Amino acid sequence: MALQDQPAYIIKMRAKPGLGDKLFELVRAGMTKSGASERFIIAREDGDPDILWNVEVFKSDQAKVNYENSPLADELSDEIINLLAEPPMRIPVHPYAALPINVS
């Protein structure tokens, strides 16, 4: 399957003050546990350690649907929502490229 055919999300979440570490660990553990993603990046804003950015690329449309309708997704969603200071921003995308940069 070509990368451009794989569904993905770009997600921004802001944890309640001081809960950034807990949010990061929960998101990382959940993504590892689900097995629905082929690759993901979790990043923390330099200026605000309670803001998480996540780029998640699913293995396929079906893997995304299966995860979103799973008990694990429901469980994680409830736990994550309880840690957030505001609703998350979630943008559905399809990757264009994910290539190593050849630095000479």
Q: What residue ranges belong to the model's regions?
A:
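Short, low-complexity N-terminal intrinsically disordered segments enriched in polar/charged residues
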Residues: A2-L3, D21-E25
